[in-house]
Amino acid sequence: MNSDLALLRLLQLASPGLPVGGFTYSQGLEWAVEAGWVRDIKSFSAWQREQMNDTLAYLDWPVLARLYYACKADDADAFARWSRFLLANRETAELRLEEQQRGAALARLLDGWQLGQAPAWRPSLELSQLGGMAWLAVHWSIPLRQLALGHAFAWLEGAVMAGVKLVPFGQQAAQTLLRDLGEILPGVIDQALALGDDQLGGGLPLLAIASSRHETQYTRLFRS
């Protein structure tokens, strides 16, 4: 696949139009706003920076790399192992359910394209969205670093759009946040992709608490 087509496929994977429910989750932000932990643009930005540096950099993006390499090596056992590792590191029932719901949605999309149907791969593809993205990236010849950057921006855009509804702030502020927080992503991605297996795993206690409390929050805009 030529580089232009690979870029277009990456944009498709990172698009908010990808039918995996990306904008239906707040990942604890809804409770954090209600609790007063996030109350303005400054505290929202700090909340997202913490997630990028302490969770995504040590879990999501290095695991994405391992899923990608497993697909390139046609190693279904390694793919299954890292898919389970990712799910096990989701600290709340809500976050685990979100991961599985996103994974199942992307797996259904693959079904429609008659891709990823081998019995050794199909059950693992349902466990996480990252697994399906890695599988498609290898199938479409998308380079790993570009895939990680695409996933990172899609995550950031989803978080900022949730902030627009919850904090709230306007579209000008949202675009400024995307610009400023986006500047951090290349360096964080480089750090994440350089980690060894024994360095993986990260979590934020406040995020876990916020997600747990969101499960029983009385009034919610976002899915639990």
From Swiss-Prot:
Keywords on record: Chaperone, Cytoplasm, Nickel insertion
Annotated compartments: Cytoplasm
UniProt cross-references to InterPro entries, sorted A to Z: UreF (IPR002639), UreF_sf (IPR038277)
Annotated coiled-coil segments of the chain: none
Gene3D superfamilies for the chain: Urease accessory protein UreF (1.10.4190.10)
Principal subcellular localization: cytoplasm
Pfam families associated with the record: UreF
GO CC aspect terms: cytoplasm
PANTHER family recorded: UREASE ACCESSORY PROTEIN F
Family listed: Belongs to the UreF family.
Purpose: Required for maturation of urease via the functional incorporation of the urease nickel metallocenter.
Identification of the protein by name: Urease accessory protein UreF
Gene name as annotated: ureF
